[in-house]
Amino acid sequence: DFIQTNTKADIVDINMGCPVNKVVKNEAGAKWLKDPDKIYHIVKEVTSVLDIPLTVKMRTGWSDSDLAVENALAAESAGVSALAMHGRTREQMYTGHCDHETLARVAKAITKIPFIGNGDVRSVQDAKLMIEELGVDAVMVGRAAMNNPYIFTQINHFFETGEELPELPFDKKLDIAEDHLKRLVDL
């Protein structure tokens, strides 16, 4: 109720994927991935008091991906509006590679809500692979946007036209960075 009364939020997102120790030691973030029932009850409780959409981001699991589908289905059946999954376990943190096989299994299992694939989306081709081969409904770009904030334009352009945009010239990248800095200062 606080969120809807005191903010202008259009959506609430629960991050069940945060792998850092200071979060998981407090029984939060990726720690919840060990217990699909807990995921269900948390999502059910939050959706019962919200009039705006609730989304969840999670990882494929804690130390393995055995519960990935079960965790995703728990969130879906509890009423989440969309689910994003990072294709690494908590144990992996940010190392290794995105587990495409697990994301594809979850994409097949989730049928009532949009499923968003995340992890190693560094290019238009990575986004295309996730959508066309893994079956996700959308992609979430993470750390790759720090090196290439233009990636969102590139991906959108590709899916709208079927054409890849050329790499931005360095001076254009500097102009964009300067614009972002000015906007940050204006906040």
State where each predicted segment sits.
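Active-site beta-loop-alpha junctions enriched in small/polar residues
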Residues: 17-19, 57-63, 88-90, 120-122, ...
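Alpha/beta catalytic cores of nucleotide-metabolism and tRNA/nucleoside-modifying enzymes
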Residues: 41, 49-51, 65-82, 94, ...
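Short, functionally important structural connectors and interaction interfaces within domains
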Residues: 8, 25-26, 86, 90, ...
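Active-site entrance/lid segments in N-terminal catalytic domains of soluble metabolic enzymes
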Residues: 1-69, 73-76
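Non-cysteine beta-strand/loop elements that form the S-adenosyl-L-methionine
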Residues: 11-20, 77-88, 141-145
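Short glycine/serine/threonine-biased micro-segments
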Residues: 11, 15, 27, 59, ...
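Glycine-rich tight-turn/loop motif centered on a GG-T
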Residues: 21-39, 88-100, 161-166
